Amino acid sequence: TNRALLLTDEGQALLPGLAEAFALMHHALASLETLDDTGVLTVSMAPSFAAKWLVPRLESFQSLHPDIDVRVTASMNLVAFADDGVDCAIRYGLGQYPGLVVDKLLDESVVPVCSPALRGMGAPPDLLRDVTLLHDDSPEQDASCPTWRMWLKAAGIDGVDAGRGLHFNQASLVLEAAIAGRGAALAKVQLAGEDLRSGRLVRLFDVSQPVAFGYYFVCPPAKAAQRKVALFRDWILRETKADAAYPKKN
């Protein structure tokens, strides 16, 4: 049989007060996330972006805000902000992140690079027929990011065995191998920016090929109101704006 639950007269009398109390409790719990300014900022991003872009610049943020301790979580996994204890993230994608605050940081493109010593061994495209090709097999690749086979075909360069060479599962390892003179790499320009500016890497061709993915700052709306997140967001927007205006050629 179906039985309905009915409040007693005493329960009916208490109901308005209980509803108000639960509403206040919900509001207080929701406010805790906004008020959590412990001084520890946890940021998630891809390993290669952390190693090649963020780390060289992180001292700037620390000098501006010494009271904020930054914890970098390097992972390709999409974080669950509440469950993983992450305040904000830098994501490589198309910018479609429903329910999150999203800021476009940087576009990305790809260009062949090598060490200055290797470049001195010959001129492209002949050089590509003689050197080891370095391949990026990382999950950071997107469908619009060319492989060596795709790039060589688009450039009209033949006589190069596009399948040979060394393979790595992280973009930063590809760049480190190129810096060490192990071969030529198809480098993401944003990741290789510091190495190109410093002369550790040089371009083999002037033309870079844009890719569909870019880099985005994301965080939950409640996190965006926190001082530590707001300061990091403002800082990285300034850094990426300056970076986009600074040439990455050598």
Regions from the PLM with identified roles:
Residues 26-33:
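A short, exposed helix-loop element centered on a Lys and neighboring polar residues
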Residues 38-98, 249-250:
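Central regulatory/effector-binding core of bacterial HTH transcription factors
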